[in-house]
């Protein structure tokens, strides 16, 4: 269960096999990765009211590894690939709110 408070209202979401979650204070979003097999295979992004904005599988041949922040204090997703991608296993992915998609932003080194 993932839970937070927004405008004095408790938002409670059932996310099976939740691995990690982070709040993006800049864009007022909640990111959650779940279903570890062995690493997470599902990413969900919600607005602060609990509405699901994105449900995503990881890129092909990758897993969601962890959630962190970029220099702008926005949540970014690290994806880990089984095979090198341009010399790296781990890559940062950002959420594009306008296109409602993830895009690779650079190596996670």
Predicted segment positions?
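Surface-exposed loop/turn elements that mediate protein-protein interactions on large endomembrane-trafficking
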Residues: 2-15, 41-59, 86-107
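Repeated scaffold domains used in trafficking and secretory/extracellular systems
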Residues: 13-27, 58-72, 106-109
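Short beta-strand elements that form the blades of beta-propeller/WD-repeat-like
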Residues: 1-3, 24-37, 73-86
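A mid-sequence interfacial segment
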Residues: 59-94
